[in-house]
From Swiss-Prot:
Classification via SUPFAM superfamilies: LigB-like
Pathway connected to this protein: Aromatic compound metabolism; 3-phenylpropanoate degradation
Catalytic activity: 3-(2,3-dihydroxyphenyl)propanoate + O2 = (2Z,4E)-2-hydroxy-6-oxonona-2,4-dienedioate + H(+); (2E)-3-(2,3-dihydroxyphenyl)prop-2-enoate + O2 = (2Z,4E,7E)-2-hydroxy-6-oxonona-2,4,7-trienedioate + H(+)
Gene that encodes it: mhpB
Family label: Belongs to the LigB/MhpB extradiol dioxygenase family.
InterPro entries xrefs: DHPP/DHXA_dioxygenase (IPR023789), Xdiol_dOase_suB (IPR004183)
GO terms, biological process: 3-phenylpropionate catabolic process
Gene Ontology molecular functions: 3-carboxyethylcatechol 2,3-dioxygenase activity; ferrous iron binding
Record protein name field: 2,3-dihydroxyphenylpropionate/2,3-dihydroxicinnamic acid 1,2-dioxygenase
Gene3D superfamilies in UniProt: LigB-like
EC number in record: 1.13.11.16
Subunit comment: Homotetramer.
Length: 312
């Protein structure tokens, strides 16, 4: 058994017009460093904790956590469309181990995943299907949300199971850090949008194009300082990164959902995927972060971070 970790932010704007060449070059250079770490490790299995943006999970049934025993990319924002290489038996065994550890988790035999899962895989491996992958959905936008300590418990249970495998496993977390992009909510969404976020009504090509244009416009306004969206919070981002860098994950148990929203924004709850991933790594013992990157990126409407880590 061996474990290693790579966590990174994601953004649809990495695949869209708008961000400056300097910013993209800086992020690409950081991703290349992370890619080198992963290539040297050469994982035989990837387990990725990731959120969803109303592409695979909807309010009709919104589990806090779900493991996919089969999964397909929906192809949003130019990412991979089609099946992922999910080892079904390992995924089901992992789900059983998590349940046995006292963490209630759903299982999907047909999980749809979006750019939150696929983009980091493509950035690290070139394609989303180059390695066997077990996707673990972590709800980060569909309120009510559970407490942070349950995300840590989820990760610890997954990591304990992975420690029983005779494989090199890369654990990933996708999302964050501080950001509050325009995301529909039950309280504010108009009826057509409610049909989508509650019942999963499919989007037409025209609707997807309109959403993409809206994201580009929102980022342009945000970067220009002409936006009502909640500002990024680099101070809070660095506080979070410092906690995970020193392995003090239990400190995050005290971070209430209202605190995360107030400090980091409505979508900052994606840090839950990082908490789960680092808890999975920590289940194998103390760890050290080996590559650290952070930049506040208004052009992406996100505090963009990358970490790699391995056991000490």
């Amino acid at each position: 058994m061996a474990l290693a970790l790579c966590c990174m932010s994601h953004s649809p704007l990495l695949n869209l017009p708008g961000p400056s060449r300097d910013l993209l070059d800086d992020i690409d250079a950081a991703i290349a460093r992370a890619r080198g770490f992963v290539e040297d490790y050469d994982p035989q299995l990837v387990v990725i904790f990731s959120p969803d943006h109303y592409n695979g999970f909807f309010y009709k049934v919104m589990p806090p956590f779900c493991i996919g025993s089969s999964a397909s990319g929906v192809g949003d924002y130019g990412t991979h469309a089609g099946p992922l290489d999910v080892p079904e038996k390992l995924a089901v065994d992992c789900a059983q181990a998590v349940l046995d550890a006292g963490v209630d988790i759903a299982v999907s035999a047909s999980m749809d995943v979006d750019h939150g899962t696929v983009q980091p895989l493509e950035k690290l491996f070139g394609t989303a299907i180059s390695r066997p992958v077990i996707p673990v959905f972590v709800n980060a936008i569909g309120v009510p949300l559970g407490p942070m300590h349950r995300c840590r418990a989820l990760g610890a249970a997954v990591g304990t199971y992975l420690a029983t495998l005779d494989k090199r496993v890369l654990v990933m977390g996708s999302g964050g850090l501080s950001h509050s992009p325009p995301v529909p909510t039950l309280a504010t969404a108009p009826e057509p949008v409610l049909q989508r976020i509650v019942h999963g009504a499919p989007m037409t090509a025209e609707q997807r194009q309109a959403r993409q244009a809206a994201v580009i416009d929102a980022a342009r306004s945000f970067a220009a300082g002409d936006s009502a969206l909640q500002p990024l919070n680099p101070t809070w981002d660095h506080r979070f990164l410092e906690i995970i860098d020193r392995g003090s994950l239990s400190e995050l148990d005290r971070w209430s959902n209202s605190f995360v929203t107030h400090e980091g924004g409505g979508s900052a709850h994606e840090i839950r995927t990082w908490v789960a991933a680092f808890a999975a790594l920590q289940a194998a013992g103390p760890y050290e972060t080996t590559m650290r990157y952070y930049t506040p990126a208004p052009e992406l409407i996100a505090g963009f971070a990358i970490r790699t880590a391995r056991p000490k």
